[in-house]
Each structure stands twice: as structure tokens, then as C-alpha cells.
Regions:
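S-adenosyl-L-methionine-dependent methyltransferase catalytic core, i.e., the SAM/SAH-binding region
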Residues: 1-204, 208
């Protein structure tokens, strides 16, 4: 699936990077290569200018490689937390600037098969890299305490303990396998007034365009 990524603050990002045509730059979140392509277009490969663009999502990597073809850019499939490792493997000791556009992309939300959105019923996946444990694995095996901690620490969810309890109770009847199944369980754990007030909040994560 091809990423469509229109950078919202492109000019501001480029101004902030103050690109040197002979410099080395890192884009830690390639996505659809919207930022990466514009950075690479401003680099002069003949003078040593180079972009290293990272993403853990194989769809994003495939798209970025196609859109950066012929430019002084290298695309690596890896999480940006391992940027140092990626740069070292390419023999790069220092960079002139880095860009991180963090969040879930609109492409990932719009692709129901990825399991990030509750707009359509789909397998409960939610993996950025499409490797390792799925969200379904987590909600069907983790303890109430662990699920509550994740919701509280990463989602700042005030009803984390109640939601975790409903998840554990529901999975005793049948495995939780789809996005809408989980959404219904989450909604059932909310007080009626909160459910009405936050009906939109609990139907979709915030997208990164």
C-alpha cells in the first residue's frame, strides 16, 4: 500500500534544518517521504550531501525508496530509536540536522487492515512495523494491571483500571479479535456521561498527516 503524505509544516521544517547542500541529514520518520524528498532535493550528492531516512513500517520504506530514487538518500527499515545504530552501519559519525515527525500517519489510520482505527471492523493489529506482538495478543494475554498501566501511562486514560477490568472479563467469554469489538468493550467501561461526552475521542487516535 502506497503512503500519501502531505507535510503540514514543510517550509518551517526546512527553515529549521537550514540545509547545507553538502551536509548529512536524518529523517527519523520517513512515512510517505514528503519531508525526505524535499530535504534530498536540496542536497548535492557530488559535494557529499546525503540523507538517511528511517521508518519501521515496510509500506513506508517501500514508498520512500520509490520517491527518493535518484536522489542522495538512503532508506533504512528500522525504528528511529536505533538511529545511532543505523548511522553507524552506514559509516556516518555525525549529522548536520535531524527531523522527527512523530505519531500515527493518516495512511495507517485509513488502511483498516492495519487495525489502528475504529472506523471499520478489522483485525486488532496496531503494529507500526507489522512484526511482533499484535494488540490482540496484548489484550488477550496481559494482566489487568499491565493493561491498566499501558492505558494510564501511554494514553493518560483516567478510566484505565475500569477499562482493563472489562477487557479481562470480556476475554473470558471469547477472544478479543477486532477493532470494533475492543471499542465496544472500552465504551461499556465508561460512565454514560463520559461515553456521550467523549464519543469522538474514543473512536480514533490522532492522525499525523
Amino acid at each position: 500500500a502506497s503512503f500519501e503524505h502531505i507535510p503540514v509544516l514543510l517550509n518551517e521544517c526546512l527553515d529549521g534544518l537550514n540545509i547545507d547542500p553538502a551536509g548529512t541529514y536524518l529523517d527519523g520518520t520517513a512515512g510517505g517521504a514528503g519531508h525526505s524528498r524535499q530535504i534530498a532535493l536540496r542536497l548535492d550528492g557530488a559535494k557529499g550531501g546525503r540523507l538517511v531516512s528511517l521508518d519501521q513500517d515496510p509500506d513506508a520504506v517501500q514508498t520512500a525508496r520509490a520517491r527518493l530514487a535518484g536522489l542522495p538518500a538512503t532508506v533504512v527499515q528500522i525504528n528511529f530509536r536505533y538511529a545511532g545504530q543505523a548511522l553507524e552501519s552506514l559509516g556516518i559519525e555525525k549529522i548536520n540536522g535531524a527531523l522527527l515527525d512523530l505519531g500515527v500517519s493518516s495512511h495507517q489510520l485509513d488502511d483498516a487492515a492495519r487495525g489502528f482505527s475504529y472506523r471499520a471492523d478489522a483485525p486488532l493489529d496496531m503494529r507500526m512495523s507489522q512484526q511482533g506482538e499484535t494488540a490482540a495478543d496484548l489484550v488477550n494475554t496481559a494482566s489487568r494491571e499491565e493493561i491498566s498501566r499501558i492505558l494510564r501511562d501511554y494514553g493518560e486514560e483516567p478510566y484505565a483500571w475500569q477499562i482493563a477490568g472489562h477487557i479481562v472479563e470480556a476475554r473470558e467469554t471469547a477472544p478479543i479479535e477486532t477493532t470494533l469489538q475492543l471499542a465496544d468493550i472500552v465504551a461499556s467501561a465508561m460512565p454514560p456521561e463520559e461515553r456521550r461526552k467523549n464519543c469522538l475521542l474514543y473512536t480514533s487516535p490522532s492522525p499525523r498527516d
